[in-house]
C-alpha cells in the first residue's frame, strides 16, 4: 500500500473479543448460566425438576430452554453463528412458512428429535421421550409466566396466587391464540438482556485483571491496521464495523489508536456504560439494546418472521452514542471525498449467513468487482479463519452480480489481481 495515505474498513466479529481474553462466546455464557443443572452431561432432567420445584425465576427466557435441548442432543453452540442459525431454523424451518402457531412450533421440535432417531423402535421411543420432556418444560415455563402476567393484570399478590388453580387448557390456548411470534420475540429480548448483563460483568472483570481486555484490544487493533500497510497507525483513517456489543476502542486511552479511528459502528447495538439490576416488573434501567437475529436477505415480504431479522430489529435500536469528533462521519466518506478505500480487513468473524446482508452491502458500496480494494481475512493462532467460509461468502455475493459471468469469476479475478488474502497476524514480519 502507499505510504502516503491509508483508508481502511476493519470488520471485527466475536473472535476479536475472544482473542482479547473476553469469555464472550455463547458456549461460555451458557455454561455460566446452566452449569449448575448439568448432571452426567445432561441438563434437561434436573432443569425440569428445578422448574417444577422452584418456578421459572432463574430461567432468563424460553430460548434458553430450547438451547438446553440442543445441548443435551450433543449439538452445542460454540459460536454465535450457530445460535442464530438455530433461531432461523426454529422460526422458519423452510422458505415460505408464514409464521407458526405454538402447536406447529412444538411440531418443529417433534420433528427435530424424531429425525435423530436411527430407525429402530428403541431410538424412536427415546426421541419421543426427549421431545415430550422439552414440550413439558416449555409449557410449564409459559404457563408460569402467563400466571405472573395474570397476577399483575388483576392486582393480586403473587403469594396469594395458586399456580395449581390455573386452567391448563385455557392457558395453553391463550398462547396459541396470541401472536406467537410476538411472544417469541419478547422472549428473545429477555435472552439478549441476560446475555448483556453477563457480558457487562465479564468486561468489568477482564479489565480489573492485570491482563486487561482494553489493552489487548488496542494492541490487536493496531496489528490489524498495520498489517501489510506502510502507513503507521497514527496516520491511518480506519472505519471499524464491529459485530460485537463491546466498545473497547472507543474507550481507548492510546492517542495513536484514537487518531486513527475515524468512526466505529456497532452493527448489533452496544452495552450501556452502566448495567442495573431488574426492577420488580423485570425491566432494566437503562435498557440493554443489543440484538440477535436472522438474516433478512431471503425472508419473504410480509412474513411475520421478518420481525426477527437483524435489519428490521436494527431499525428500532437507539442511535449509537459516539464521541463528538465522530458525529456526522460516515464509513464511506473517503469514497464521497473522491478517494479510495485501500483495504477491507476482516478479523474474528465467522462469515455465517446471519450477517450476509451486511457483507453484500459493503461489497456493493466499494464496488468490489471493479475497484482496487484488497480483501484481507486475518486471524491469530487458535482463532483461524476457515477458507471455505471465505469462498462461500464470495460465491454467494457473486450470484448477485450482473452480468452473471462476473459473479462466476469473482474469486478468480480477486486472486489474479492479488486482491484477496487469508493471513495469520502472528506471522507478520
Predicted features along the sequence, with ranges:
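Extended, H/D-rich, highly charged conserved domains that either
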Residues: 45-323
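SIR2/sirtuin-family catalytic core signature
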Residues: 1-20, 26-29, 41, 45, ...
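Short N-terminal helix/helix-N-cap motif within the alpha/beta-hydrolase-1
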Residues: 20-21, 250
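Short aromatic-enriched loop/helix-cap "lid" or pocket-rim segments at secondary-structure transitions
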Residues: 22-24, 278-279
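TIR-domain catalytic/interaction hotspot
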Residues: 316-336
Amino acid at each position: 500500500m502507499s505510504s502516503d495515505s491509508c483508508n481502511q474498513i476493519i470488520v471485527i466479529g466475536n473472535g476479536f473479543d475472544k482473542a482479547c481474553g473476553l469469555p464472550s462466546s455463547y458456549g461460555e455464557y451458557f455454561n455460566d448460566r446452566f452449569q449448575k443443572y448439568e448432571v452426567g452431561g445432561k441438563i434437561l432432567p434436573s432443569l425440569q425438576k428445578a422448574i417444577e420445584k422452584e418456578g421459572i425465576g432463574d430461567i432468563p427466557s424460553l430460548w434458553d430452554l430450547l438451547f438446553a435441548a440442543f445441548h443435551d442432543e450433543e449439538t452445542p453452540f460454540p459460536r454465535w453463528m450457530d445460535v442464530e442459525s438455530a433461531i432461523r431454523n426454529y422460526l422458519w424451518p423452510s422458505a415460505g412458512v408464514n409464521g407458526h402457531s405454538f402447536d406447529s412450533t412444538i411440531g418443529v421440535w417433534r420433528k427435530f428429535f424424531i429425525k435423530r432417531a436411527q430407525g429402530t423402535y428403541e431410538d424412536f421411543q427415546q426421541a419421543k421421550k426427549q421431545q415430550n420432556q422439552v414440550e413439558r418444560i416449555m409449557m410449564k415455563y409459559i404457563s408460569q409466566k402467563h400466571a405472573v402476567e395474570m397476577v399483575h393484570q388483576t392486582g393480586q399478590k403473587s403469594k396469594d396466587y395458586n399456580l395449581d388453580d390455573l386452567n391448563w387448557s385455557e392457558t395453553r390456548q391463550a398462547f396459541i391464540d396470541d401472536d406467537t411470534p410476538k411472544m417469541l420475540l419478547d422472549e428473545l429480548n429477555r435472552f439478549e438482556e441476560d446475555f448483556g448483563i453477563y457480558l457487562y460483568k465479564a468486561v468489568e472483570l477482564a479489565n480489573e485483571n492485570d491482563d486487561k481486555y482494553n489493552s489487548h484490544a488496542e494492541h490487536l487493533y493496531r496489528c490489524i491496521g498495520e498489517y501489510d500497510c506502510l502507513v503507521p497507525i497514527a496516520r491511518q483513517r480506519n472505519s471499524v464495523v464491529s459485530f460485537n456489543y463491546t466498545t473497547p476502542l472507543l474507550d481507548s486511552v492510546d492517542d495513536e489508536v484514537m487518531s486513527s479511528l475515524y468512526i466505529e459502528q456497532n452493527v448489533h447495538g452496544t452495552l450501556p456504560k452502566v448495567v442495573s439490576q431488574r426492577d420488580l416488573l423485570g425491566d432494566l434501567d437503562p435498557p440493554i439494546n443489543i440484538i440477535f437475529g436472522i438474516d433478512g436477505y431471503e425472508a419473504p415480504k410480509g412474513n411475520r418472521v421478518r420481525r426477527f431479522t437483524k435489519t428490521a430489529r436494527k431499525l428500532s435500536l437507539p442511535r449509537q452514542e459516539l464521541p463528538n469528533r465522530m458525529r456526522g462521519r460516515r464509513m464511506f466518506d473517503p469514497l464521497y471525498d473522491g478517494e479510495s478505500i485501500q483495504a477491507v480487513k476482516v478479523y474474528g468473524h465467522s462469515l455465517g449467513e446471519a450477517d450476509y446482508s451486511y457483507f453484500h452491502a459493503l461489497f456493493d458500496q466499494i464496488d468490489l468487482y471493479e475497484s482496487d480494494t484488497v480483501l484481507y481475512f486475518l486471524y491469530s493462532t487458535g482463532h483461524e479463519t476457515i477458507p471455505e467460509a471465505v469462498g462461500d461468502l464470495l460465491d454467494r455475493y457473486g450470484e448477485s452480480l450482473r452480468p452473471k459471468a462476473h459473479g462466476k469469476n469473482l474469486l478468480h479475478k480477486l486472486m489474479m489481481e492479488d486482491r484477496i488474502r487469508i493471513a495469520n497476524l502472528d506471522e507478520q514480519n
